[in-house]
Each structure stands twice: as C-alpha cells, then as structure tokens.
Amino acid sequence: MLNRADEVAGIVYLSEVLNKDAASLSHGQKQWLEIGMLLMQEPKLMMLDEPVAGMTLNERKQTAKLLNTISQGRSVIVVEHDMNFVKEVAQTVTVLHQGAVLSEGQMADVQNDPKVIEVYLGH
C-alpha cells in the first residue's frame, strides 16, 4: 500500500509534500490530494466536480495535464464551467440546460450549436 501511495503521490504532483499535514497544502494541492485518494482505489470511472475552481493559472495547467494522464485507461467525467479548461481536457462535451442535454459532441460543434448560442448567449 505504501508503494502505491508513493506512486499516486508522484502522479498527482505531491511527492515533495507527502508527509505534510493536508491543512498546510495549497488549494490546488488539496484538489490533487482528493484526486489521489480516488486514484488509490484504481477506479475505472472518476467524476470530478469543478476540479480547477480557485486554482492558480499554473495549477490549472498542471491539473489539465494530470487529467489527460489519468484518463488513459479510465473514464473521467468533469463538471466544469470554465470552457477554456474544458477545451484542454475533454474529448466529448455535454452541455446541460434545466436538467436535460442541450448539446453533445466535440467542443467546436457544441460551441457553434444554435441551441447553445440561444440559451447561453441570448442570440
């Protein structure tokens, strides 16, 4: 188990702070710690709610890289409002409106979907 913890700490950029108290970690590091705790269970599916909320630009970039790495061999569902971040990590984008799927597909297709434009841009 300890070897797995060391391995996961490396994946989520926490090797250097592995022995620190979680309260002393930055916001981004705390998010990575939570992702690491999920990875310890070796899930086939991960669901992350706004994983980059409150992160610095550098932490956001590292998180995008992390999600691209951990999505190899598993499905990762990310709920996120930051479309610039979504562009970096998503293969498929689903836009919901009032609990129903409004549009789904590649980012460019979704962004140009007239329904999405009408609902979110009011045009």
How would you name each of these model-derived features?
Residues M1-V17, K65:
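Conserved ABC ATPase "signature" region
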Residues D21-L25:
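Conserved ABC ATPase signature
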Residues E42:
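Conserved catalytic motifs of ABC-family nucleotide-binding domains
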Residues M46-E50:
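Catalytic Walker B motif of ABC-type/P-loop ATPase nucleotide-binding domains
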Residues R60-Q72:
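Helical segment within the ABC ATPase nucleotide-binding domain
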Residues V86-E88:
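A short, surface-exposed alpha-helical micro-motif characterized by mixed small hydrophobic
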